[in-house]
Amino acid sequence: MCDFVFRYDSHIENKLSKYIKTTNGKTLLQVSNNKFITIKIGSSYGKKYISVSFNDSICFMNFIVGKRIHCQTNTISNCECCTNYTCYCKYIFQNRCIEHIKIFIAKYLPMIREISNHKFKLIDLIKVDTINNNPTVFNSIKLIKFDTNNDLIFNNDLILLIFEYGFFEDTIDVVKILLDSIQHVTFEFIDTLINIFKKNINGKDRKYFMDKIKSHTFNLSLMDFIKPVLSTDNVDLFYYVIDELTTIVGQIFCDNDTSECDNIDKLDTKFKYDSSKSIKIINHLVSISFYCPKIFKQLLIDINNIDLISDIINKLVFYNYIEYVVIIFDYLGSNIQKFIDEIFLYATSIDMIDLLIDYGADYEKIYRNRKFHKLREDIIVHIKKLIKSNKN
């Protein structure tokens, strides 16, 4: 298990000392009128710390939140205690300690932000470099009990747990990163995620949400919810996400406040689905080398303008995405003939060259193009062989 370690500097000692007593060689902290928990007080490099066993950590956090006590750190790097929070955070996430997670992200972290000079967030803990290395320098004084053999793994249930009980200030950045990386999502997961989002923007996260919308800094969009769906190649699920989120503006309670309603209208651009969003999704597919043919074809239908996708076609040809190029050509039919010779010059593989020729590219005409010599040497040789073969 992982002990909970809390900085015990002179400022905090002045506030906590009246609740601490020593009995029969044990140091006890009074967390309520009739309840005491055992703590350890140790020091490392001249700094004092309180260590609380994992089983008592919820009681301790509730006590600290109630008393609103914490070191006044300016930056995360100046608070060694934050390194130990990383260990604790990793442990409760790894072991799915639901009640501990609820208290830590819903009460404890917000309390630190409220009374500290540093806007401490959950993402600060997850991104700390020591998370997969040595978790803390304080092991030498036996304050930490932590197994570092396993990496921190987030599954869909844990993402939902964080999103439901944490505040947007903590959860948005984390959920955004996780949605960008998870695969094999289900309808139930996406549906629950969207419902939590809708509930929170009209509930506990409303003020933060409105402030961020007003300043154009709300860091979650339709694209973030779509990314995990791409791995399913499920067209119905894809459009379910779009339908649910493109109507979100009309589901936000406005309270007849004109300025607030104006701010909500600004949200429309983040969750509106149009041809520009379709192009953005295709570019994302290209950037991550991901193949989802059914959704890709629907994106082409939604764009419905060949001029808007010419750059995308050039990119797909250049990076040798043969499967996507075939889908585009089959979708466009005879319309591809007016620019197939031009995209021929973007090809970087013989397989792509042969595909373009199969779809009608005039390689003899391209051979006479002054840009022909800029193609790869093996492609030039291949074209010359084809021309020679035709002459024979």
Curated annotation (Swiss-Prot):
Belongs to the mimivirus L17x/L18x family. This is Uncharacterized protein L185. It comes from Acanthamoeba polyphaga mimivirus.
